[in-house]
Amino acid sequence: MATSPQKSPSVPKSPTPKSPPSRKKDDSFLGKLGGTLARRKKAKEVSEFQEEGMNAINLPLSPISFELDPEDTMLEENEVRTMVDPNSRNDPKLQELMKVLIDWINDVLVGERIIVKDLAEDLYDGQVLQKLFEKLESEKLNVAEVTQSEIAQKQKLQTVLEKINEALKLPPRSIKWNVDSVHAKNLVAILHLLVALSQYFRAPIRLPDHVSIQVVVVQKREGILQSRQIQEEITGNTEALSGRHERDAFDTLFDHAPDKLNVVKKTLITFVNKHLNKLNLEVTELETQFADGVYLVLLMGLLEGYFVPLHSFFLTPDSFEQKVLNVSFAFELMQDGGLEKPKPRPEDIVNCDLKSTLRVLYNLFTKYRNVE
């Protein structure tokens, strides 16, 4: 640091008194210049630090290890594109999720004579999504039934997705699909969309928990295609999302005591057969034989000692809707008998959810176990 020269009392004053102020002025200028240079150096260090951080984030970028579709290689400099890792498609949980969603769509659209076989190939143009939403929402959309050109397809898809987003009422950052991604047959976007629809409309299906998909992010840098992989979560805890997250004794049995679970199942089978045998009916599989609601309705009549008129329910239901109506009717009979409203949804029983079925039957057992 520059300092001013000390004055000696025995030395006469300098004949050039302006020199010291000039030196001070120079020192001041150098100080300011030094400060400016220091600030610039600090700013450069910050910039380098930020760049280092960005490089750390992008460190996983590496040459692509699998063959890309020719369309996916047509990228502009620094353009980014995402796609599903081909190896990830074989994941059993992902395969299960896609099958559950395909079966659900086909069941909803059975009256439309539409059969979906591949989610990306069959949903990208908006036709199936239109019919699915119209059926779920009971609302006719003002869109063209058939579209051939890409422009017409995207216009239709835009209208359909706007209606879906309005119904779901999701915050913008939670919407993980758009016209371009769906029309580009982006499986991740389509899965996010279908999962959101199934949960909002409380579809009678059980989605597998914690399904993730390996996504490859491709970017063009200095003329070279590079990629990195990320895990994209499609479903989390589906029970918590559907409001069925309160754990009870059956959660514990399923998770930690499968041997005791079998004892409970045998006890309940003995209980229901004790009464259903009076009608020459017998149960061997709890989750499947109560799924259409018929045995539940008949069982309630036997336990309460009355005859349920056959016109009050569907004796041979042939659709999900009729099965749900049967189970809902049985739930009403249970409440009429003094039981609380069952915690499971009728759709859970129809979907052969064993845990839900056991909860309902166990409530009946605790109230009616001494009934002959």
Curated annotation (Swiss-Prot):
It is found in: Cell junction, Focal adhesion; Cell membrane; Cytoplasm, Cytoskeleton; Cytoplasm, Myofibril, Sarcomere, Z line. PROSITE patterns: CH (PS50021). Residues 95-202, 262-369 form the Calponin-homology (CH) domain. One of its GO terms (cellular component) is focal adhesion. Plays a role in sarcomere organization and in smooth muscle cell contraction. Required for normal development of the embryonic cardiovascular system, and for normal septation of the heart outflow tract. Plays a role in sprouting angiogenesis and is required for normal adhesion of vascular smooth muscle cells to endothelial cells during blood vessel development. Plays a role in the reorganization of the actin cytoskeleton, formation of lamellipodia and ciliogenesis. Plays a role in the establishment of cell polarity, cell adhesion, cell spreading, and directed cell migration. Belongs to the parvin family. This is Alpha-parvin. It comes from Rattus norvegicus.
